[in-house]
């Protein structure tokens, strides 16, 4: 079987609340770490989320 091109990643909040989103990314086209601005319900505002590994 071939290696999958999409991998699951965890987007961890930079507000240090421990809140995270799980999403997928194409590892061949997006080689650098992903960052997105999304809503953190614990902090109750939009913050930047950075990519972290799923354990």
From Swiss-Prot:
<comment type="similarity">
    <text>Belongs to the bacterial ribosomal protein bL33 family.</text>
</comment>
<dbReference type="GO" id="GO:0006412">
    <property type="term" value="P:translation"/>
</dbReference>
<dbReference type="InterPro" id="IPR038584">
    <property type="entry name" value="Ribosomal_bL33_sf"/>
</dbReference>
<dbReference type="InterPro" id="IPR001705">
    <property type="entry name" value="Ribosomal_bL33"/>
</dbReference>
<dbReference type="GO" id="GO:0003735">
    <property type="term" value="F:structural constituent of ribosome"/>
</dbReference>
<dbReference type="InterPro" id="IPR018264">
    <property type="entry name" value="Ribosomal_bL33_CS"/>
</dbReference>
<dbReference type="InterPro" id="IPR011332">
    <property type="entry name" value="Ribosomal_zn-bd"/>
</dbReference>
<dbReference type="GO" id="GO:0022625">
    <property type="term" value="C:cytosolic large ribosomal subunit"/>
</dbReference>
<dbReference type="Pfam" id="PF00471">
    <property type="entry name" value="Ribosomal_L33"/>
</dbReference>
<protein>
    <recommendedName>
        <fullName>Large ribosomal subunit protein bL33</fullName>
    </recommendedName>
</protein>
<keyword id="KW-0687">Ribonucleoprotein</keyword>
<keyword id="KW-0689">Ribosomal protein</keyword>
């Amino acid at each position: 079987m071939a290696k999958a091109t999409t991998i699951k990643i965890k987007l961890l909040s930079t507000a240090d609340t421990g809140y995270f989103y799980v999403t997928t990314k194409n590892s061949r086209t997006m080689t650098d770490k992903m960052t997105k601005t999304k809503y953190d319900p614990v902090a109750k505002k939009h913050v930047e989320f950075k990519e972290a590994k799923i354990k």
